[in-house]
Regions:
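Conserved alpha-helix/loop element of class I SAM-dependent methyltransferases that forms part
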Residues: 25-44
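Class I SAM-dependent methyltransferase SAM/SAH-binding core
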Residues: 48, 55-105
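A conserved beta-strand element that flanks and buttresses the S-adenosyl-L-methionine
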Residues: 117
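C-terminal alpha-helical "lid/dimerization" subdomain adjacent to the S-adenosyl-L-methionine
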Residues: 150-198, 203-207, 212-214
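Conserved beta-strand signature within the Rossmann-like core of class I S-adenosyl-L-methionine
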Residues: 143-149
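N-terminal, positively charged/glycine-rich alpha-helical extensions of SAM-dependent methyltransferases
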Residues: 1-18
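A short His-aromatic
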Residues: 123-124
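A short glycine-rich, Lys/Arg-flanked "PGG" loop and its adjoining helix->strand segment in the class I
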Residues: 130-141
Length: 224
């Protein structure tokens, strides 16, 4: 199945609210656990979450690694508003900062983060190269990097089956977003080609579930 682009941002408040209320606990906690297992020596410093959504993952990192300060970035004002409320409710204002901004060209100091993570952002981007360029620009040499996203199935029928198997009870708007995201996602082969083009071919890149891939490693010295 060919890749079918979807809108880059969830700007609609109904979409954002449905996403925030959906049950991504297992996937999001699995993402944080994967990072902690891959980089057990990272116990503090600064972490950047690209495409942080309503801040569930930044807050999970704040709980998992008490020494971290976290900057979350999302291009959707509706998402960031929900995330800021979640951060306030969790009393993590001093450790978790959320910014509404888009890549490329984030107004953040180059090489300022010990770690960069991203879950389910890449498939929103028409040109994935800008994502990897921003990662290399913002992460310090040797920074830990974990990226996870959906894997594009080989047919629309398979995409519908994945939606029904994993989101049958979710709101219709979320189910449609899930289907669109599967159709816009990259295959494992395509991601490995992106890593090679970014000179990150030493990274591990493999399937993380029946519908997700994950890529992780440390940025090379002098990567920026």
């Amino acid at each position: 199945m060919r890749r079918v682009l979807e809108p880059e941002l969830m700007t609609d408040e109904e979409q954002a609210q449905a996403y925030a209320q959906a049950d991504f606990a297992d996937v999001n906690q699995g993402f944080v656990d994967r990072f902690c297992a891959a980089f057990p020596d990272l116990t503090g410093g600064s972490l950047l979450d690209l495409g942080c959504g309503p801040a569930d993952i930044p807050l999970r990192f704040a709980r998992a690694i008490p020494g971290l300060t976290i900057t979350g970035v999302d291009g959707s004002e509706a998402m960031v508003a929900l995330g800021r409320q979640a951060v306030k409710d969790a009393e993590q204002d001093g450790r978790v900062l959320l910014l509404c901004a888009r890549i490329p060209g984030l107004n953040l100091r180059p090489q300022s983060f010990n770690a960069v993570v991203s879950n389910s952002l890449l498939h929103h981007l028409p040109k994935p190269a800008v994502f990897w360029q921003e990662v290399l620009r913002l992460g310090r040499p040797g920074a830990a990097l974990l990226v996870m996203d959906l894997h594009r199935p080989d047919s629309e029928e398979r995409a519908h089956a994945i939606v029904e198997a994993n989101a049958a009870d979710e709101a219709p708007v979320l189910k449609q977003d899930f289907f669109n995201s599967l159709c816009a996602a990259f295959t494992l082969y395509e991601v490995r080609e992106q890593l090679r083009a970014a000179r990150l071919q030493a990274f591990r890149c493999e399937m993380a579930s029946d519908r997700h891939w994950a890529a992780w490693g440390r940025l090379p010295k002098g990567a920026a």
